[in-house]
Amino acid sequence: MKSRIPVVLLACGSFNPITNMHLRMFEVARDHLHQTGMYQVIQGIISPVNDTYGKKDLAASHHRVAMARLALQTSDWIRVDPWESEQAQWMETVKVLRHHHSKLLRSPPQMEGPDHGKALFSTPAAVPELKLLCGADVLKTFQTPNLWKDAHIQEIVEKFGLVCVGRVGHDPKGYIAESPILRMHQHNIHLAKEPVQNEISATYIRRALGQGQSVKYLIPDAVITYIKDHGLYTKGSTWKGKSTQSTEGKTS
């Protein structure tokens, strides 16, 4: 049996709050990579953005990290990493990728088999490939003037790679065709299709909560309880960041 390439998926974003759509992205991406026969996804990482991101209605990072941890209680392969949220200032996506790549070089995680319980090999694990996981809406932002640095896009798709999950109203193949950098490295961009259209947005969740509407079955129950216990996303609870930074590479 040919050895598969181990992969770690990293998603950067606000996770304000984390939703079932965020979690589904990981599952869809993992299935897609496994079905290629080339890759074995061994870990997923959720990296909530720093408080200085400056986005309206952004809950404090310790709340967003806590909610992500609660949402991931039932996952045996995805974890939340607070490093980005704990930095002194907002971090560009490529810098977050560099940090986690450096960690993987120092201490690669154990590679598990398709049943998520048994190691594929008894030999020392190869250093996994780190790929940025995003929705097609983020891929579209690569075209937005002055939002991404070309050098950063180049590094992301050349050194790391992308796994892009499709969304309604977006044409990821078209976005790639329109970008010289993306076209050059399209072999390192994986387009995963979500068979069940899932358009849950954190923006909608916040609006619904602010209006006292139910969000059950849209976000995990444990997250709903946390939001209620801490009075988040209600009228008058808005937390604003300290600066207005670029929205580069971030998911709501």
UniProtKB/Swiss-Prot annotation:
- Enzyme Commission (EC) number: 2.7.7.18, 2.7.7.1
Print the keywords alphabetically: ATP-binding, Magnesium, Mitochondrion, NAD, Nucleotide-binding, Nucleotidyltransferase, Pyridine nucleotide biosynthesis, Transferase
What is this enzyme's class at the first EC digit?
transferase
Q: Per UniProt, what is one Pfam family of this protein?
A: CTP_transf_like
Q: How is the cofactor bound?
A: Divalent metal cations. Mg(2+) confers the highest activity.
- Alphabetized InterPro entries for the sequence: Cyt_trans-like (IPR004821), Euk_NMN_adenylyltrnsfrase (IPR051182), NadD/NMNAT (IPR005248), NMNAT_euk (IPR045094), Rossmann-like_a/b/a_fold (IPR014729)
Residue positions annotated to bind NAD(+) are S14, F15, W90, T93, G135, D137, L147, W148, R167, N198
Q: Which domain of life is it from?
A: Eukaryota
Function field: Catalyzes the formation of NAD(+) from nicotinamide mononucleotide (NMN) and ATP. Can also use the deamidated form; nicotinic acid mononucleotide (NaMN) as substrate with the same efficiency. Can use triazofurin monophosphate (TrMP) as substrate. Can also use GTP and ITP as nucleotide donors. Also catalyzes the reverse reaction, i.e. the pyrophosphorolytic cleavage of NAD(+). For the pyrophosphorolytic activity, can use NAD(+), NADH, NaAD, nicotinic acid adenine dinucleotide phosphate (NHD), nicotinamide guanine dinucleotide (NGD) as substrates.
Residues reported to bind ATP: H22, K56, K140, T203, Y204, I205, R206
Q: How does it assemble?
A: Homotetramer.
| Cellular localisation | Mitochondrion
Check the record and name the PANTHER family matching this protein.
Answer: NICOTINAMIDE MONONUCLEOTIDE ADENYLYLTRANSFERASE, NICOTINAMIDE_NICOTINIC ACID MONONUCLEOTIDE ADENYLYLTRANSFERASE 3
Catalysed conversion reaction: beta-nicotinamide D-ribonucleotide + ATP + H(+) = diphosphate + NAD(+); nicotinate beta-D-ribonucleotide + ATP + H(+) = deamido-NAD(+) + diphosphate
Citing just one GO molecular function, the answer is: ATP binding
The record's account of tissue expression is: Expressed in lung and spleen with lower levels in placenta and kidney.
* Cofactor or coenzyme needed: Mg(2+)
The name on file for this protein is: Nicotinamide/nicotinic acid mononucleotide adenylyltransferase 3
The biological pathway it contributes to is: Cofactor biosynthesis; NAD(+) biosynthesis; NAD(+) from nicotinamide D-ribonucleotide: step 1/1; Cofactor biosynthesis; NAD(+) biosynthesis; deamido-NAD(+) from nicotinate D-ribonucleotide: step 1/1
Q: Which family does it belong to?
A: Belongs to the eukaryotic NMN adenylyltransferase family.
